[in-house]
Every structure is written in C-alpha cells, then in structure tokens.
Amino acid sequence: MTNTLNTAENRRTMYLLEGNIGAGKTSLGNVLKASSQFEFLEEPVDTWREGFAGNLFEMFYTDMPRWSFTFQIMAFTTRAKTWSEILEKVSGDQVVLERSIYTDRNVFAKNLYAVGAMNDSEWQVYQQLWEFLAQNYCDKPDKILYLRTPAELCLERIKMRGRNEEQQMQLDYLKRLE
C-alpha cells in the first residue's frame, strides 16, 4: 500500500488518541483541533448508530454475546475506511485519530473473545480480516497518545455524556478494558 501520510511531497504526522471509553479522548482531540495545529478525526459513532441496517452501537451494548462479532467487524472496517479515505483529504500536517484499529483488535475484540462473547471461529475470521486490512489499507501511526483514566471516572463521564446506548455499561466491563 502507498503510505498516504508520509510520501515525500506529503509528510504528515499521525497521532492515535487512545484510552478507555469515557477517558476524555474526544475532549482532548477537540482542544488539539482548536489550537489550529492539528486535524482531529473523531470516532465514527454516528455511523455505527445510523449507517447500517440498525443501530449496531445500541445492539452491541444491549446483547454483547449476540452482536460482538458483527460490531467489532463494523467498528474496525469503519476505522480502516477512515484511514484510507479521510486521511487523504485532510490538509494539516498533524493528524489525530480518536481510537485505532490496534485498540479494536488488542483491547476490544480480544477482551470479547476472552469472555466468550466471540467464539473461536469468529475470533479467527476477525483476526484474518484485521491482518489483511491492516497490512493493505492502514498507514502506521507515528505516535500514540494514551489517556490513562480510572474506570470509575470513565463510568461517571459516560453517564454524564448521556449516550443512550452506553447507559447500561458496567464498571467491570471498563475495568477489563484497562
């Protein structure tokens, strides 16, 4: 794959903004964007709510064992699409992406597999698709910014931001993601 970020005529620095759900990634990303020194690409939550045959964001949080595989495939592919399409269009020389394909696999999907919400076959399919898309469609980041926020504070923030889909989230789930 041609690296869309780092060709000789188009050198950009790509930062991944990582952290638990409710850690403050969007808030920090918006502060960086307001500085006019960074482009900020938010996690595509609206796509997960409206871009498919149902609100997969809500379906996932309502019935994780049923929707884990579907949601993780969708979340990963929307991020890969973001990297391959949107990054070509941004004009800034410093780009911050909220969350990444690496967290999709190494935190979320891996955790769901470990607790039995994805079976062996689903996990193997997920990993093979992840490897293919990561190698062929996703540029490697230059830096990773990780917000370490206690799970208890993350849960408070999740409740305050008021996304209906997340209101039943449990503290133990956030602790497993740390």
Q: Where in the sequence are the language-model features?
A:
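A basic- and aromatic-enriched beta-loop-alpha substructure that forms the phosphate/nucleotide-
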Residues: 71, 76-119
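Extreme N-terminal, non-catalytic leader segments
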Residues: 1-14
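Hydrophobic anchor at the beta1->P-loop junction of P-loop NTPases
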Residues: 17
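P-loop (Walker A) phosphate-binding loop of NTP-binding proteins
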Residues: 20
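A glycine- and Lys/Arg-enriched "phosphate-lid" helix/loop adjacent to the NTP-binding pocket
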Residues: 106-178
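Conserved substrate/cofactor phosphate-moiety recognition/catalytic segment
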Residues: 34-78
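Post-Walker A alpha-helix
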Residues: 28-29, 33
